[in-house]
């Protein structure tokens, strides 16, 4: 664990910021995936879900565990589009409340639970464990991968997108491009190979490995537009330095993409 990805700090940050983030960013708290480059943010975010679902071989009516579910956007989308039996977990009580309200408003029966991803246990197993932009927050990622493997049916799928740093990153590049992201977003960035090793050590066979930078970097062009909202900075000042660091990290994310030092990756693995 670095000094940024502390669970209590992460919980507090999302409890404070989620209502504002939703009002600015929409139903989904993740990147968009642009194909033509002309799509709206909302369309691009749905296209990311579809891209991950396709890579994971998602079928109708499957049982999905959405780990780090945010305000429930992906779970609700998958329940409506694929008839998925979706269960979402998050460590933020505010996000659980927001997700339940969103599901009720959409007439979706997805379940949302307050649960630590490193300690998750269920009586049932799932066809798919789905984790979009969440694992980089976890202090002990090895515990998540072990728990995720146990949550899967034999032959089940773990589908991950997450934030990574470039391999063999020089210290100067780390300090300039990666540390501000870790500080503002409360994450610890690994290289993709670290996740691959954890997948293999938990009897999860990698079937898809992809870098999505080309299609997803536009998310942070839009992020910079969000920063032009003066009211947001006034709110941030009221909430303190961590919210300010969070907003400043939007620029760092864009710089990380532009420099090639930040990687947005997709991994899909099957339980052997």
Predicted regions: what they are:
Residues 164-186:
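Short, glycine-/aromatic-enriched active-site segment of Class I SAM-dependent methyltransferases
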Residues 187-203, 209:
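Short alpha-helix
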Residues 208-272:
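Conserved Class I S-adenosyl-L-methionine
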